[in-house]
């Protein structure tokens, strides 16, 4: 809902969407964690939502919400992605997990770069490194996707969000969109 409400607010200017997005951002940032130990895919989804709310609504969010969101991205996404105490196999995965987790981490890193530059840089570099080999498997030959159409839609959504965020923020996706 954060993504949808943030978009709706930007398109209409109706503050009910801003209020709902900010309420939801505060709610998820108050969670004790984003389920990283059991299902890192949840982290990718939460990081994406908070990142878009943070970025698209930044000037309208309260200072407390901005701080809470930046801290949550650091604690619940970046630090968990760097945690060596459990196996984060999405980095090597050649399925939707690679796209969703890396996509969420990259969107979060780009949105909150000023707050966490070292961690953000690490997230972006690791995602660029691990996403390209996955793309080479997932969409070849000729755009085929090994998990079927449902997961194609799910994984590709996060892939496109990541590519768009990289291009709009950095001016390049480092060649990912050229991957055969």
Where do the model's predicted regions map?
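Aromatic-lined, polymer-binding surfaces characteristic
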Residues: 1-180
């Amino acid at each position: 809902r954060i993504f949808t409400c943030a978009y709706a607010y930007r398109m209409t200017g109706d503050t009910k969407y801003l209020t709902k997005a900010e309420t939801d951002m505060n709610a998820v940032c108050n969670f004790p964690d984003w389920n990283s130990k059991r299902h890192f895919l949840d982290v990718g989804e939460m990081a994406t939502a908070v990142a878009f709310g943070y970025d698209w609504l930044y000037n309208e969010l309260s200072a407390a919400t901005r701080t809470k969101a930046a801290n949550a991205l650091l604690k619940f996404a970046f630090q968990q992605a760097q945690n060596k105490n459990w196996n984060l196999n999405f980095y090597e995965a050649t399925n939707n997990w690679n796209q969703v987790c890396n996509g969420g981490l990259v969107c979060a890193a780009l949105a909150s770069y000023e707050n966490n530059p070292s961690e953000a840089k690490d997230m972006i570099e690791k995602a660029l490194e691990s996403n390209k080999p996955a793309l080479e498997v997932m969409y070849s030959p000729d755009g085929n996707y090994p998990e079927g159409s449902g997961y194609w839609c799910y994984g590709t959504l996060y892939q496109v969000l990541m590519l768009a965020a990289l291009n709009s923020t950095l001016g390049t996706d480092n060649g990912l969109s050229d991957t055969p």
